[in-house]
Amino acid sequence: MTLYIRREASKLWRRFCSEITTEIGLLAENWKYLLAGLLCQYIHGLAARGVHYIHRPGPTLQDSGFFVLPELGQDKGFISETVFTCVFLSFFLWTFHPFIVKSKKIYTVLIWCRVLAFLVACQFLRVITFYSTQLPGPNYHCREGSELARLPRPHNVLEVLLLNFPRGVIYGCGDLIFSSHMIFTLVFVRTYQKYGSKRFIKLLGWVIAILQSLLIIASRKHYTVDVVVAWYTVNLVVFFLDKKLPELPDRTTALLPVISKDRTKEESHKLLNGNGVDPADRRPRAQVNGKDSNGGHTDNATNGT
């Protein structure tokens, strides 16, 4: 038993080291895209913080979802946040499964480049939308009479740039259309739908996305229109952007993605060694009439003809 555990642990460690080497090479080539995506996440948070300064509380708007779904109450608002946290952590961990699982379809660096591209495109549209029209927030801390509904003028620039994290992120107001939680949820679900392998988890992801939508409305964190707009906007953005982005390499084959630096080195090595001919041109030719086309002269010499 101990020998089996050691052997499996050794295999796992070799697989982990091999994956680390591959991912470091991909990171060296794609780090600027990841950095730009993370920077845009901060800019999105900065925009959401900025709209809170101009938010003005008022009567909650008439909403069909509020009539259909009973109000959960302020003490149960954590339920939707818990569901979202589970979705986020599950997807995050899944993107790192190639480091330990033998069967894999994705590269961690490349999948996050793709996911961040989807998120940034959706968040760009979201910022334009909630700055175009400021609606009175339906959340409890955004209603009239709440001290958090209006933000006082900032005392310094750092107060704005630091976003008053994490309190300023949790108790934001004014960034309504469309739901940021639904952007992340739908992007994650659609990504797993394409690159995941478990059919049950794919179905479960869509069920959780629907449940998350209902919980957001029942918690009065967003109007129904915020959730509805998120559903068709995110799906359309991902659909069209997915066709424009280069497809991920297929990991079902034994070939690794060729990094441009390695490709240049390989081509230079071939030229220096006089191996510029495609190796495919050197493969043995098929026999014709019982004679090898490459070795025709040799065979003739051997036979004395």
UniProtKB/Swiss-Prot annotation:
**Where does the chain cross the membrane?**
34-54, 81-101, 105-125, 169-189, 199-219, 222-242
- Bilayer topology: Multi-pass membrane protein
Gene Ontology cellular-component terms for this entry are: membrane
Give, as one word, the top-level EC class: transferase
On the tree of life, the source organism's domain of life is Eukaryota
Q: Where is this region: Disordered?
A: 266-305
Q: Tissue specificity, please?
A: Expressed at low levels in roots, leaves, stems, flowers and siliques.
Gene Ontology MF annotations? inositol phosphoceramide synthase activity; phosphotransferase activity, for other substituted phosphate groups
Compartment(s):
Membrane
Keyword set includes Cytoplasm: no
Primary location: membrane
Q: Please, one GO biological process term?
A: sphingolipid biosynthetic process
- Per the UniProt entry, the Enzyme Commission number(s) are 2.7.8.-
Q: Which UniProt keywords apply?
A: Lipid biosynthesis, Lipid metabolism, Membrane, Sphingolipid metabolism, Transferase, Transmembrane, Transmembrane helix
Record's compositionally biased regions (Polar residues): 290-305
The active-site annotation reads: 181, 222, 226
- Per the similarity annotation, which family is this? Belongs to the sphingomyelin synthase family.
Q: Which purpose does this protein serve, as stated in its record?
A: Catalyzes the transfer of the phosphorylinositol group from phosphatidylinositol (PI) to phytoceramide, an essential step in sphingolipid biosynthesis.
Kindly provide the name given to this protein in its UniProt entry.
Phosphatidylinositol:ceramide inositolphosphotransferase 1
Taxonomy-wise, where does this protein's organism fall, top ranks first? Eukaryota, Viridiplantae, Streptophyta, Embryophyta, Tracheophyta
